[in-house]
Amino acid sequence: MRSGEGSTAAAAAAEEEKVKVAAPFRLAELGLRVCAVPLAVASVWEMATNKQVDETYGEVRFSDLSGFRYLVWINAITAAYSVASILLSSCRFITRFDWLIFILDQASAYLLLTSASAAAEVVYLAREGDREVSWGEVCSYFGRFCGAATVSVALNAAALLCFMALSLISAFRVFTKFNPPSQSNSKQQLSQEQGKPVVSG
């Protein structure tokens, strides 16, 4: 009985310690999710409204470039998910969805990374060109368009940083659910393997 009561008390103490440790992370997590929403929305708005007309070279829109279209879609999806995850975070049964949120946080971070890479490559080529394939830079003619695209990519990168931090926090929350094996359980398993009776203190 003493052994059982001791293990129960230890488990309760460990659970209480987890709650104390997780509390600051909950606040940080909520803050990051709230910050990610305006960053992603601003990135979408800056890119989706981006166009410029030049008398000599015509009109250029974000939709003309696949990398920019991809960035808009990914940021829109990320913003919607951020709002949904904020609503889930306010519910008491959030622990039921810890694994789902962990997976979606990881996926959002990877998608934001790929969209930032794709859009940044387009911006770089627009600013610097590519001499190997005889592509000239175009930002000297479409400076406002390039500037808005750069701002959108920067906002996307800021949202990415939020989700990188969220990925770490959600991973911490998920994996702290697993308790390390107690000393009594380890002794019992070792005794069973050796064929010896277990003596409880």
Swiss-Prot record:
It is a multi-pass membrane protein. Residues 180-201 are annotated as: Disordered. Residues 180-194 have a biased composition (Polar residues). Keywords: Cell membrane, Membrane, Transmembrane, Transmembrane helix. The chain crosses the membrane at residues 27-47, 71-91, 99-119, 149-169. Residues 48-70, 120-148 are extracellular. The keyword Lipid metabolism does not apply. Coiled coil: none annotated. It is found in: Cell membrane. It comes from the Eukaryota. Signal peptide: none annotated. InterPro entries: CASP/CASPL, CASP_dom. Residues 1-26, 92-98, 170-201 are cytoplasmic. One of its GO terms (cellular component) is plasma membrane. Belongs to the Casparian strip membrane proteins (CASP) family. Homodimer and heterodimers. NCBIfam families: A_tha_TIGR01569. This is CASP-like protein 2D1.
